[in-house]
């Protein structure tokens, strides 16, 4: 038996810390099924803490939230789109669209007018993320969304920080570009609506960038750079159990490719968890710059992987995985420890890579 366990109180406490630090309304970002934790459950718990605004990337997720009873909450769809079917979904869900291009503005305007409605929207400025958003030098086009689209009621403006966890100069540069656009609009007599820029790391690093709201996702899970330093608890763990213990002689090998050779007589615990369950699975590393390489090296050294080591917890003991992680199993060195069959094993996994066969349990 294995399950991914999520502690409700940890999530609530993280939310309280975030809301206090922000000091302004918080958009709870629930993209990718709530970062793998379950969008429906995350929304329920965060609403209990006072969250009244949500953000998603997919138009259908906005409708799901409405269907689950979130009829009064603001829901921001953070993905700009020039596809009429997606714009229609946003309008029908009474969600807030993101407009990040002249094409997206035209599409949303036409769809909303065709529905006999006025769609709410936030204008997005691309200050360096490179995906969605008007470029800062497209001021004329940005202004038209406010003044020349009768089917759109612009209620906000925002940007997306790309390096708020590490690069202060770049982040401040992005913020400055957004503020410049806002100043231009206001100078032309336009009420820009809700202004927001700070994301999960931005909330904790830049007190002067909170504006009217913030957008927070991964910080709710405690899985951000320096999360513990900010008082956040890491949310979620994979729970399994020891199904067999055995003793092998010196020289015995472990895993495909005989990745480890026992240096002495070794007592082993077998746990039925592998990369099919998301254990030891991670996204491909981005190694575009030397500092990216150094960051991964630093992290690996801190958690033991710099020496090829992977650890899990069994009955409260930190134990080493022997050999390569298999599809469905791992063998662990429990020599000298009072560990027996049935003992609980705790493993750290990214819930985005969990097998759909693994049950999520909120406790």
Task: Give residue ranges: language-model regions.
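Active-site-proximal beta-alpha core segment in soluble small-molecule metabolic enzymes
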Residues: 2-6, 10-13, 23-196
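Active-site anion/phosphate-binding pocket segments in diverse small-molecule metabolic enzymes
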Residues: 3-6, 12, 175-363
């Amino acid at each position: 038996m294995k399950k991914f366990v999520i502690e409700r109180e940890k999530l609530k406490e993280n939310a309280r810390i975030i809301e206090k630090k922000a000091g302004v309304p918080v958009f709870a970002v629930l993209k990718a099924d709530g970062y793998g934790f379950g969008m429906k459950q995350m929304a329920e718990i965060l609403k209990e803490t006072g969250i009244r605004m949500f953000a998603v990337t997919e138009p259908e997720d906005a409708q799901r939230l409405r269907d689950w009873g979130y009829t009064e909450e603001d829901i921001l769809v953070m993905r700009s789109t020039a596809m009429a079917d997606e714009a229609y979904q946003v309008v029908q869900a009474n969600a807030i669209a993101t407009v990040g291009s002249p094409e997206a503005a035209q599409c949303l305007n036409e769809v909303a007018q065709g529905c006999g409605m006025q769609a709410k929207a936030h204008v997005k400025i691309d200050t360096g993320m490179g995906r969605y958003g008007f470029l800062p030098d497209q001021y004329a086009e940005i202004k038209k969304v406010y003044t020349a689209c009768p089917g759109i009621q612009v209620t906000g403006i925002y940007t997306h920080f790309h390096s708020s966890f590490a690069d202060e100069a770049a982040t401040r540069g992005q913020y400055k570009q957004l503020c410049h656009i806002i100043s231009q609009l206001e100078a032309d007599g336009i009420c820009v609506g809700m202004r927001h820029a700070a994301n999960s790391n931005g909330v904790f690093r830049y007190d002067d960038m909170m504006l009217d709201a913030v957008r927070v996702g991964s910080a709710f899970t405690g899985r951000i750079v320096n999360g513990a330093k900010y008082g956040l608890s890491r949310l979620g763990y994979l729970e399994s159990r020891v199904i067999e213990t055995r003793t092998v002689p010196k020289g015995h090998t472990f895993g495909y490719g005989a990745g480890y050779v026992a240096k002495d007589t070794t007592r082993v615990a077998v746990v039925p968890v592998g990369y099919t369950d998301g254990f030891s699975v991670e996204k491909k590393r981005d190694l575009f710059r030397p500092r990216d390489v150094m960051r991964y090296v630093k992290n690996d050294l801190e958690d033991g992987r710099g020496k090829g080591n992977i650890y899990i917890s069994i009955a409260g003991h930190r134990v080493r995985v022997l050999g390569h992680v298999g599809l469905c199993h791992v063998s662990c060195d429990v020599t000298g420890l009072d560990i027996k069959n049935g003992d609980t094993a705790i493993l750290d996994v990214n819930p985005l890579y969990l097998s759909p066969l693994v049950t999520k349990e909120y406790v």
